Amino acid sequence: MRIFLTAVFALLFIVPNIQAGKVQIPEDTEVKVKFDPGMKISSKLLQPGIPLLIYLAEPVEIGGKVIIEEGAMGKAEVLEVKGASKPGKPGYLKVAFVDIKPKGEYNTLDSAAIKLKGEVESEGGGKKLLSWLFIFGLFIKGGEATLPSDAIYTVQIGETVRLSND
């Protein structure tokens, strides 16, 4: 009788937890993100601290179940920018991926965004040799740094996060 009561008591706590649909995404899980395709990301146009809109490029799945749907919106931030300058110095751009807001059936327990970690950088083409070959080359600027907005970038989840479909 005692074993039966223990089993019934255990089931009372296990069954609601299974039905609740709680999942955990471990830190360093790779996810794929992309920028808004209409956005021009260039060292000529941006300044440090400016937020950029990103989207989840592929759904996050655990055990064959979609936890975060494709298209979930998030944020990246411009960390460093150096515009192209004379004589022939290239531009530089560094962007950090900040977070992504869950989309779909599951949400974080406190409805917070999921932290991301990862950075991408770009350097424009230099024209220094050309600038020294000709006297007028001193007036030639280097190329601006750009990031393709149609590319897919692999980043990681910044910390272990628990989600629920309650």
Descriptions of predicted regions:
Residues 21-166:
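Contiguous beta-sheet cores, especially beta-hairpins with glycine/small-residue-rich turns
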Residues 6-16:
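Bacterial N-terminal signal peptides
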Residues 1-5:
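Bacterial N-terminal signal peptides that target proteins for export
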